[in-house]
Amino acid sequence: MPTKKHRRKDPESPQEPSEKTKEQLVEGELRKLRQQFRKMVDSRKSFNFRSQQKITNQRKEIKTLQEEQDEITLLLNLIKSSRNLDLNEKNYLELRFLLQTKEDYEALIKSMKLLLAELDEKIVQMEKKIINQRQIFTKIQEANNPRKLQKQIHILETRLNLVTVHFDQMLTTNAKLRKEIEDLRHEKAAYDNVYQHLRRRLLTKKKTMNVAIEQSAQAYEQRLEAMARMAAMKDRQQKDISQYNLEIRELERVYDHETKLKSFLLIKLNDRLEFEEQSKKEEALKAKKYGKKSKGASFESYEVAHLRLLKLTKTGNLNQLIEEFLAKEEKNFARFTYVTELNNDMEMMHKKIERIQNEILRLRSQQKSSHDDSYSILRELEEKLKKTTEEADMYENDYREITKTLEYLKNSVENLFKKINCDATKILVQLGETGKVTDINLPQYFAIIEKKTNDLLVLESYKRLMEMEVAEAEVQPSFLNPFWGGSALLKPAEPIKVIPPVLGADPLSDKLDEVEQPLDHSSLRQMVLSHYATRESRNRDSMPEKGDELKSKKKVTV
């Protein structure tokens, strides 16, 4: 009866939780719907607020645009009025008249400027002509005095010698400076090459250092991962060992219980066998005694055993007892197989742990060796980097000093170029030139400066010559001897016609103008000597002609 009640209650029990779950689901859906409703209400409010803001902004914009339209229409009406149109017409006519007058005056000013420029050119030409005439007149006057000419020639030769010496010194210094500049350029190129080579080496060293750092970081990460794996495996091993110990204890307890049950059942079976043997013996005796009553006795013995077995069972069901016995035997067999499997697993785990420990030791040794190698490589790289940085700093300092000297030379060349008013059109015509002195156009600036110095030296010599001529012209005439009274009766000597030299055609200056490249000391010296030789040959040719003329004149007078 109690079993029936229990069976009736079983189908009713799942209905109660299903209703509760349904109510919970309904409540959850209601909450979700309420939340959605609240969100929809909030979104609607926000949308209404935004739409109202947009409408107000649009109204404001419409209002401002309407005001602007009103202002524009008002301005258009004012502009289109007849009074404003008349004023505009008057202003237009006045402006046109003023522009016409401006153009006329500008044309007049241009014509007057052209006239003034022509007059200035004429004045300059006339002044040049006057200066040339004066120079020719002074030359003619000075040419009549041969002593003065000889003295002047001697002075000019000495001055020319001094100037040539000074010029030679300038050329030697210039050549030395050029050589120094070339040496500095070569040194700069060598330092640049070394700097680039060291920079490339530094970059490669940095790359190798980065690779070594990455490898060391990877090795460190691998070591950390291996250590984490080792720790995890140790924890897992400890957990497995504790679990294994618990399971072994449980199995030992179950095994002890089963052994006790088996021993109890064996004792019971032995008792039953002894009882059956005694019963068999009694039955045999009874069979011998009674003969015919053997079958009844055996049946009675079976009944006695059956009753004893029924006493052993609580419910009085032998089938249930047999099933329980078989189930226990199966459980014991399954536990025995499980214990054997666990033993095998434990052996495998021990082997695996030993293998992992050996692998960990090997990895540690490899990591130690790699760490030592990487440390030694890093030390070598640091030493090399230190050396390369020191060399790079040294080369950079040399490069800075060279650049400073070059900058000083460039600045001095530029200042000298500006002071002596050299013409830089030939350099500026070239592509990429900005008017500044650079490493590329420095020889061109030197050539122009050299040419200008030659011109200045020629002008200086000419100026000194003119000063000497002026000084000699201002000297008073020599004292006349009073005792030479008869000298006044003598016929005065006729003036010697001396052809004045043409000042415009100077062969040396023409040759210097023709030369485009800077001259060496030897070439310039040769040019000056050839010019001096030609001038002396001319003087020698002119002297006998003058002597012949004087002789002929004396003969005529006699």
Curated annotation (Swiss-Prot):
Q: Which UniProt keywords apply?
A: Coiled coil, Differentiation, Spermatogenesis
Is Magnesium among the key words of this record? no
Q: Does the keyword Transmembrane helix apply?
A: no
What Pfam families does its record include? Answer: ODAD1_CC (PF21773)
- Transmembrane stretches, start-end: none
Q: Which GO terms describe its biological process?
A: cilium movement; outer dynein arm assembly; spermatid development
Sequence ranges of Basic and acidic residues compositional bias: 9-26, 533-551
Positions of region (Disordered): 1-26, 531-558
Task: Tell me the superkingdom of the source.
Answer: Eukaryota
Q: Which InterPro entries does this UniProt record tie to the protein?
A: ODA-DC/CCD (IPR051876), ODAD1_CC (IPR049258)
GO terms under cellular component: axoneme
Query: What is the role of the protein in this entry?
Result: Plays a role in spermiogenesis. Involved in the elongation of flagella and the formation of sperm heads.
Q: Can you name this protein?
A: Coiled-coil domain-containing protein 63
Q: Which organism is it from?
A: Bos taurus (Bovine)
